[in-house]
Amino acid sequence: VHYELTRKIAEGGMGLVYEATQKGIGGFRKVVAIKLIREEYSAIEEFRNNFIGEAKLVADLIHTNIVQTYHLGKIGEQYFMTMEFVTGWNLEEFLDRHVETEQYIPADLAVFIVSRICRGLGYAHRKKDSQGRLLGIVHRDVNPKNIMIAQEGDVKLTDFGIAKALDLMYNKEGDVIAGKDEYLS
Protein backbone atom coordinates (compact mmCIF):
# COMPACT_ATOMS: atom_id res chain seq x y z
CA VAL A 1 0.00 0.00 0.00
CA HIS A 2 1.23 3.47 -0.80
CA TYR A 3 -0.31 6.92 -1.01
CA GLU A 4 -0.14 9.60 -3.67
CA LEU A 5 -0.94 13.12 -2.43
CA THR A 6 -3.35 14.89 -4.77
CA ARG A 7 -3.91 18.33 -3.22
CA LYS A 8 -3.85 20.18 0.09
CA ILE A 9 -7.39 20.56 1.44
CA ALA A 10 -6.82 22.06 4.89
CA GLU A 11 -4.10 23.67 6.94
CA GLY A 12 -3.96 24.32 10.65
CA GLY A 13 -1.37 25.58 13.08
CA MET A 14 0.08 22.15 13.76
CA GLY A 15 -0.89 20.08 10.75
CA LEU A 16 -1.93 19.72 7.14
CA VAL A 17 -4.63 17.62 5.49
CA TYR A 18 -4.32 16.34 1.93
CA GLU A 19 -6.61 14.54 -0.45
CA ALA A 20 -4.71 11.43 -1.53
CA THR A 21 -5.12 8.21 -3.47
CA GLN A 22 -4.38 4.99 -1.63
CA LYS A 23 -2.96 2.46 -4.09
CA GLY A 24 -2.69 -1.26 -3.57
CA ILE A 25 -2.28 -4.50 -5.45
CA GLY A 26 -4.26 -5.33 -8.56
CA GLY A 27 -4.97 -1.68 -9.37
CA PHE A 28 -6.78 -1.05 -6.07
CA ARG A 29 -7.42 2.67 -5.56
CA LYS A 30 -9.28 4.58 -2.86
CA VAL A 31 -9.53 8.32 -2.26
CA VAL A 32 -8.61 9.16 1.34
CA ALA A 33 -7.64 12.16 3.43
CA ILE A 34 -4.17 12.20 4.98
CA LYS A 35 -3.46 14.30 8.05
CA LEU A 36 0.20 15.14 8.73
CA ILE A 37 1.92 16.80 11.66
CA ARG A 38 3.95 19.76 10.45
CA GLU A 39 7.61 18.77 10.21
CA GLU A 40 8.70 21.32 12.81
CA TYR A 41 6.33 19.69 15.34
CA SER A 42 7.21 16.07 14.51
CA ALA A 43 10.40 16.39 16.57
CA ILE A 44 8.49 17.53 19.67
CA GLU A 45 7.47 14.55 21.80
CA GLU A 46 4.31 16.18 23.19
CA PHE A 47 2.94 16.84 19.68
CA ARG A 48 3.81 13.33 18.50
CA ASN A 49 2.14 11.82 21.57
CA ASN A 50 -1.00 13.91 21.07
CA PHE A 51 -1.18 12.97 17.37
CA ILE A 52 -0.79 9.28 18.19
CA GLY A 53 -3.32 9.72 20.99
CA GLU A 54 -5.83 11.24 18.57
CA ALA A 55 -5.43 8.28 16.20
CA LYS A 56 -5.89 5.77 19.04
CA LEU A 57 -8.88 7.66 20.35
CA VAL A 58 -10.77 7.80 17.06
CA ALA A 59 -9.73 4.41 15.63
CA ASP A 60 -12.82 2.70 17.04
CA LEU A 61 -15.25 5.58 16.57
CA ILE A 62 -17.27 4.05 13.76
CA HIS A 63 -20.38 6.16 13.30
CA THR A 64 -22.06 7.69 10.28
CA ASN A 65 -21.61 11.19 11.75
CA ILE A 66 -17.88 10.90 12.52
CA VAL A 67 -15.13 10.91 9.89
CA GLN A 68 -13.53 7.48 10.13
CA THR A 69 -9.80 6.97 10.74
CA TYR A 70 -8.23 4.06 8.85
CA HIS A 71 -4.51 4.04 9.60
CA LEU A 72 -1.71 5.64 11.62
CA GLY A 73 1.70 5.58 9.98
CA LYS A 74 5.15 7.06 9.88
CA ILE A 75 7.50 7.75 6.98
CA GLY A 76 10.93 8.76 8.22
CA GLU A 77 10.13 11.13 11.08
CA GLN A 78 6.80 12.26 9.57
CA TYR A 79 3.66 10.89 11.27
CA PHE A 80 0.42 10.65 9.32
CA MET A 81 -3.14 9.47 9.73
CA THR A 82 -5.31 8.16 6.88
CA MET A 83 -8.98 9.05 7.13
CA GLU A 84 -12.23 8.92 5.24
CA PHE A 85 -12.34 11.56 2.50
CA VAL A 86 -15.59 13.54 2.50
CA THR A 87 -16.54 15.06 -0.84
CA GLY A 88 -18.33 18.24 0.12
CA TRP A 89 -17.76 21.31 2.26
CA ASN A 90 -17.05 22.17 5.84
CA LEU A 91 -19.85 24.02 7.62
CA GLU A 92 -17.92 27.31 7.55
CA GLU A 93 -17.70 27.15 3.73
CA PHE A 94 -21.38 26.18 3.57
CA LEU A 95 -22.41 29.13 5.75
CA ASP A 96 -20.14 31.56 3.87
CA ARG A 97 -21.69 30.51 0.57
CA HIS A 98 -25.15 31.27 1.92
CA VAL A 99 -24.01 34.70 3.13
CA GLU A 100 -22.42 35.46 -0.27
CA THR A 101 -25.63 34.57 -2.10
CA GLU A 102 -27.79 36.31 0.54
CA GLN A 103 -29.73 33.12 1.20
CA TYR A 104 -30.95 31.86 4.53
CA ILE A 105 -30.41 28.28 5.57
CA PRO A 106 -33.87 26.76 6.12
CA ALA A 107 -34.58 26.09 9.79
CA ASP A 108 -35.25 22.40 9.18
CA LEU A 109 -31.84 22.03 7.48
CA ALA A 110 -30.09 23.81 10.36
CA VAL A 111 -31.84 21.52 12.85
CA PHE A 112 -30.86 18.48 10.76
CA ILE A 113 -27.17 19.51 10.73
CA VAL A 114 -27.08 20.16 14.48
CA SER A 115 -28.95 16.92 15.24
CA ARG A 116 -26.42 14.86 13.27
CA ILE A 117 -23.49 16.48 15.06
CA CYS A 118 -25.22 15.76 18.37
CA ARG A 119 -25.61 12.11 17.33
CA GLY A 120 -21.88 11.85 16.59
CA LEU A 121 -20.92 13.60 19.84
CA GLY A 122 -23.34 11.44 21.83
CA TYR A 123 -21.91 8.27 20.31
CA ALA A 124 -18.33 9.37 21.10
CA HIS A 125 -19.25 10.30 24.66
CA ARG A 126 -21.01 6.96 25.29
CA LYS A 127 -18.24 4.86 23.67
CA LYS A 128 -16.77 2.09 25.83
CA ASP A 129 -13.37 0.44 25.65
CA SER A 130 -12.81 -3.31 25.15
CA GLN A 131 -13.26 -3.91 28.90
CA GLY A 132 -16.63 -2.15 28.90
CA ARG A 133 -15.38 1.01 30.64
CA LEU A 134 -16.95 4.27 29.56
CA LEU A 135 -14.45 6.42 27.66
CA GLY A 136 -16.44 9.64 28.01
CA ILE A 137 -14.88 11.24 24.93
CA VAL A 138 -15.29 15.02 24.77
CA HIS A 139 -14.37 16.61 21.40
CA ARG A 140 -13.37 20.08 22.77
CA ASP A 141 -13.11 21.73 19.34
CA VAL A 142 -16.55 21.60 17.75
CA ASN A 143 -16.66 24.50 15.31
CA PRO A 144 -17.81 25.03 11.70
CA LYS A 145 -14.42 24.05 10.22
CA ASN A 146 -14.64 20.64 11.95
CA ILE A 147 -18.11 19.79 10.63
CA MET A 148 -18.24 18.33 7.13
CA ILE A 149 -21.31 18.26 4.89
CA ALA A 150 -21.01 15.63 2.18
CA GLN A 151 -22.51 16.18 -1.27
CA GLU A 152 -24.84 13.27 -0.49
CA GLY A 153 -26.14 15.12 2.61
CA ASP A 154 -24.28 13.26 5.36
CA VAL A 155 -23.01 15.44 8.20
CA LYS A 156 -19.73 14.37 9.81
CA LEU A 157 -17.62 15.58 12.70
CA THR A 158 -13.86 15.60 12.24
CA ASP A 159 -10.62 16.64 13.97
CA PHE A 160 -10.56 15.06 17.41
CA GLY A 161 -7.04 16.50 17.84
CA ILE A 162 -7.69 18.01 21.28
CA ALA A 163 -10.37 15.56 22.39
CA LYS A 164 -10.11 14.09 25.86
CA ALA A 165 -11.05 10.61 26.99
CA LEU A 166 -9.99 9.75 30.50
CA ASP A 167 -6.28 8.90 30.20
CA LEU A 168 -6.02 7.63 26.63
CA MET A 169 -4.31 10.77 25.39
CA TYR A 170 -1.19 12.49 26.62
CA ASN A 171 -2.51 15.65 28.25
CA LYS A 172 -1.31 18.04 30.91
CA GLU A 173 -4.79 18.47 32.36
CA GLY A 174 -5.27 21.86 33.90
CA ASP A 175 -2.28 23.44 32.14
CA VAL A 176 -4.29 24.71 29.21
CA ILE A 177 -7.85 25.49 28.18
CA ALA A 178 -8.41 23.63 24.93
CA GLY A 179 -10.63 24.87 22.13
CA LYS A 180 -11.47 28.05 20.28
CA ASP A 181 -12.69 31.01 22.34
CA GLU A 182 -15.81 31.54 20.22
CA TYR A 183 -17.01 27.98 20.84
CA LEU A 184 -16.05 27.32 24.47
CA SER A 185 -18.81 26.93 27.02
Language-model segments: residues:
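Protein kinase catalytic-loop region centered on the HRD/HxD motif
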Residues: 119-137
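Conserved short submotifs of the Hanks-type protein kinase catalytic core
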Residues: 76-90, 94
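Activation-segment/catalytic-loop signature of the eukaryotic protein kinase fold
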Residues: 72
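Conserved N-lobe ATP-binding subsite of Hanks-type protein kinase domains
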Residues: 16
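AlphaC helix of the eukaryotic protein kinase fold
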Residues: 38-60
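AlphaC helix of the protein kinase catalytic domain
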Residues: 91-105
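Activation segment signature within eukaryotic-like protein kinase domains
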Residues: 113-114
